[in-house]
């Protein structure tokens, strides 16, 4: 039985019908503008389309005025290797030898609190489809995770579901998870962050874009059937319990969190790649947030004509779905392609080969309207650009918070510091066993890091490294970083510190950083203080990219990350892509590969503890000024690391960030299963040397035979260095001479024991 629907003609004849636009997230003036655009009230289906496409998630209505700064500051020199940038499904970069890499990071924060497993799983699935839509084969994923306090009763539920969701979906797709970050902080209680990155590889000529052109070309929906899951996911996130019943009484209990099937997506990947190889696709768009509303309006808006869709031809998973529900559904594993009439049968044949359901649901028209019919009646008739690109843009109030001065003035300088050898030893053990700094092995071992056989480096390396060409050994490096604590103290500097660390992590593997993506996680845009944080972070990131000469290729904004009046720590996640001409020269993290290595600390160490993990773990303190950022130094450091890798002068490298030198030495020693002796400079404060979080520093292990050549290179380039110790392959301890010694077994127990104790040796 076909449900009664609200048609365009009915809407024109009944202008005074009350509509639930506020419940769908639209404001009074936004609803009035829709009526002005259409010259009448919208139909139920049109209202559904505008509400999801004009949502903060899809329209960027509060962030657009600030995001323009990325484009304004990107120079032609920075753009020269960029094949696709902001506005496309994902950024694409020419990485040489005819290869292109596409990469992007997206958020799935709110769904991952409501339904952690499916929220995280479909976050992975969604970003993978963005990469597929560019014409690439997905080759790796990463994740940036933020949870509430590690000892909070609800944190275990969220951690368990999110980690299993990421692993379950990514492992089933056969995609290696090569790195990321996991942070615990009370500000994320009730509002975890799940940011997933995916990278894909293709030949330069295989790039595909999302546009519908060519009058008469067919619109084909292929992949999974359309159900009721995910409706309202991008506009009004519901939290009813999922009953699994998509018909009758159970319908109202369906979650707004999407339900994923990785095996359907795995087949969809191979199907898409064969379609691309056969040149059967004119334009393509994945179905993610806002579902068909987004896919059809964006394809039509980017094309040179209009589009007509027959909605009753969409294969459904649930009985009696309305047009509004079909257009709003965020059911996963679906793609929408534009195909010439003569290629439709060949397209369908490929889909049949892979057992992928495919249906012609419409065609490109010569008009300028997006028209959607339902059993012959018109339920949508709109200018597509007004849905996809011409939504409201707000220049919201920006105000530096009143508390900012007091926060900066509350420095950690007066906090008690460890003074004796025993106190230094205990501080080190306390920090490496804290949830903030302890090993993430319990999490990462639930992910397959080496599937497909092209992973060269993965967690716990500074960056993931993937081989993309078996013949030449060409590869890419990926790193993601963020620091909400630094960004809270100074949003401009905090975003720059995240960029600097991701840049440095990529360089520490021997790769050359080439491009940036981001995911900007903030509180409510209706709070002027949050908008100030956002504005400053965007400017800091953009200015940093100019200083480094690498472009922002795209990104994502996630607002409303707060519980009540309490916003999360502002968390701009930055991803950096690097290129390495031969993965055989990659630099690992673990020391001890060469006998008698010398440990050298590159960069300057200063007394910088504002926002540090030491202040948090030992004193529960957040205040002061974050570490200084010096992008010229970061570039110099990257050049030295790349040259050292190319000339065989570096056998291991590990960047210094949270936890400082002490954390870096512990991680490098445990990774290499090798002891070492650290000799602190006589004129330096041992506490500052061990725990400072000054930026622009890397610990390198240099073969004894290369020490003179390497240090001369550093001096010639005016890069500060200090000989900080030696690798002692006959030792099973970390010794800080004149202060303390800790057996590697004790270090490992402290470092690796925390998460299993908190969350169980295995996930439930």
UniProtKB/Swiss-Prot annotation:
The active site is at residues 57, 108. Mg(2+) 1 binds at residues 106, 556. Pathway: Purine metabolism; IMP biosynthesis via de novo pathway; 5-amino-1-(5-phospho-D-ribosyl)imidazole from N(2)-formyl-N(1)-(5-phospho-D-ribosyl)glycinamide: step 1/2. Keywords: ATP-binding, Cytoplasm, Ligase, Magnesium, Metal-binding, Nucleotide-binding, Purine biosynthesis. ATP binds at residues 60, 104, 518, 555. InterPro entries: PRibForGlyAmidine_synth_PurL, PurL_linker, PurM-like_C_dom, PurM-like_C_sf, PurM-like_N, PurM-like_N_sf. GO terms for molecular function: ATP binding; magnesium ion binding; phosphoribosylformylglycinamidine synthase activity. One of its GO terms (cellular component) is cytoplasm. It is an enzyme of class 6 (ligase). Disulfide bonds: none annotated. Part of the phosphoribosylformylglycinamidine synthase complex involved in the purines biosynthetic pathway. Catalyzes the ATP-dependent conversion of formylglycinamide ribonucleotide (FGAR) and glutamine to yield formylglycinamidine ribonucleotide (FGAM) and glutamate. The FGAM synthase complex is composed of three subunits. PurQ produces an ammonia molecule by converting glutamine to glutamate. PurL transfers the ammonia molecule to FGAR to form FGAM in an ATP-dependent manner. Belongs to the FGAMS family. HAMAP family: PurL_2 (MF_00420). This is Phosphoribosylformylglycinamidine synthase subunit PurL.
């Amino acid at each position: 039985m076909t449900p009664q629907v609200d048609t365009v003609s009915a809407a024109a004849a009944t202008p005074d019908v009350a509509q639930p636009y506020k419940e769908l997230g639209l404001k009074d003036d936004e609803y009035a503008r829709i009526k002005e655009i259409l010259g009448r009230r919208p139909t139920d289906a049109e209202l559904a389309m505008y509400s999801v496409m004009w949502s903060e998630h899809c329209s960027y209505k509060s962030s657009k005025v600030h995001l323009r700064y990325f484009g304004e500051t990107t120079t032609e020199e920075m753009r020269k290797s960029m094949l696709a940038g902001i506005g496309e499904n994902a950024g694409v970069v020419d990485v040489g030898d005819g290869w292109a890499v596409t990469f992007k990071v997206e958020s799935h924060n709110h769904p991952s609190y409501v339904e952690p497993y499916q929220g995280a799983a479909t976050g992975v699935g969604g970003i993978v489809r963005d990469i597929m839509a560019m014409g690439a084969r997905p080759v790796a994923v990463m994740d940036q995770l933020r949870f509430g306090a590690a000892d909070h009763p609800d944190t275990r539920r969220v951690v368990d579901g999110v980690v299993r969701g990421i692993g379950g979906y990514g492992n089933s797709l056969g995609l290696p998870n090569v790195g990321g970050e996991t942070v615990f902080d009370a500000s994320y209680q009730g509002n975890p962050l799940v940011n997933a990155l995916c990278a894909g590889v293709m030949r330069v000529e295989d790039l595909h874009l999302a546009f519908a052109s060519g009058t008469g070309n067919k619109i084909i929906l292929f992949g999974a059937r359309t159900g009721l899951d995910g409706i309202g996911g991008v506009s009004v996130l519901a939290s009813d319990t999922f009953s699994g019943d998509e018909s009758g009484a159970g319908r109202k209990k369906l979650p707004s969190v999407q339900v994923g099937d990785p095996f359907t997506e795995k087949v969809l990947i191979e199907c898409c790649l064969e379609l691309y190889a056969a040149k059967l696709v004119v334009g393509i768009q994945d179905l993610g947030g806002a579902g068909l509303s987004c896919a059809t309006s964006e394809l039509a808006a980017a094309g040179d004509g209009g589009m007509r869709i027959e909605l009753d031809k969409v294969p459904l998973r649930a009985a009696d779905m309305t047009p509004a529900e079909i257009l709003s559904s965020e059911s996963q594993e679906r793609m929408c392609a534009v195909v010439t009439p003569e290629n439709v049968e060949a397209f369908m044949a490929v889909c049949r080969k892979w057992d992928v359901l495919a249906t012609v649901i419409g065609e490109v028209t010569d008009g300028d309207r997006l028209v959607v019919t339902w059993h012959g009646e018109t339920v949508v008739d709109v200018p597509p650009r007004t849905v996809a690109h011409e939504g409201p843009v707000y220049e919201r109030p920006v105000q530096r918070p009143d508390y900012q001065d007091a926060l900066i003035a509350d420095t950690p300088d007066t906090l008690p510091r460890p003074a004796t050898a025993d106190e230094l030893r205990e501080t080190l053990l306390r920090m490496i066993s804290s949830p903030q700094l302890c090993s993430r092995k319990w999490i990462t071992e639930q992910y397959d890091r080496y599937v497909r056989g092209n992973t060269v480096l993965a967690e716990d390396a500074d960056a993931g490294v993937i081989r993309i060409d078996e013949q030449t050994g060409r590869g890419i490096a990926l790193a993601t970083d963020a620091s909400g604590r630094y960004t809270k103290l100074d949003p401009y500097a905090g975003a720059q510190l995240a960029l600097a660390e991701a840049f440095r992590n990529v360089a520490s593997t021997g790769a050359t950083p080439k491009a940036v993506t981001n995911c900007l996680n903030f509180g409510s845009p209706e709070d002027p203080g949050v908008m100030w944080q956002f504005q400053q972070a965007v400017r800091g990131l953009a200015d940093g990219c100019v200083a480094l000469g690498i472009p922002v290729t795209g990104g994502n904004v996630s607002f409303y990350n707060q519980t009540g009046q309490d916003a999360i720590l502002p968390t701009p996640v930055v991803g950096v892509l690097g290129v390495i001409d031969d993965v055989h020269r990659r630099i690992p993290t673990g020391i001890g590969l060469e006998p008698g290595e010398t440990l050298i600390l590159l960069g300057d160490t200063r007394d910088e503890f504002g926002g540090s993990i030491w202040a948090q773990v030992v004193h529960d303190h957040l205040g002061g000024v974050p570490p200084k950022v010096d992008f010229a130094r970061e570039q110099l450091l990257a050049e030295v690391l790349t040259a050292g890798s190319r000339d065989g002068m570096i056998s291991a490298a590990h960047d210094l960030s949270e936890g400082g030198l002490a954390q870096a030495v512990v991680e490098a020693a445990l990774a290499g299963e090798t002891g070492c002796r650290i000799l602190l400079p006589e004129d330096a404060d041992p506490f500052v040397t061990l725990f400072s979080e000054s930026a622009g520093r890397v610990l390198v292990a240099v073969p004894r035979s290369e020490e003179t050549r390497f240090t001369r290179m550093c001096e010639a380039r005016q890069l500060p260095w200090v000989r900080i110790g030696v690798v002692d392959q006959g030792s099973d301890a970390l010794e800080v001479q004149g202060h303390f010694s800790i057996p590697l077994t004790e270090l490992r127990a402290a470092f690796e024991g925390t998460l299993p104790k908190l969350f169980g040796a295995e996930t439930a």
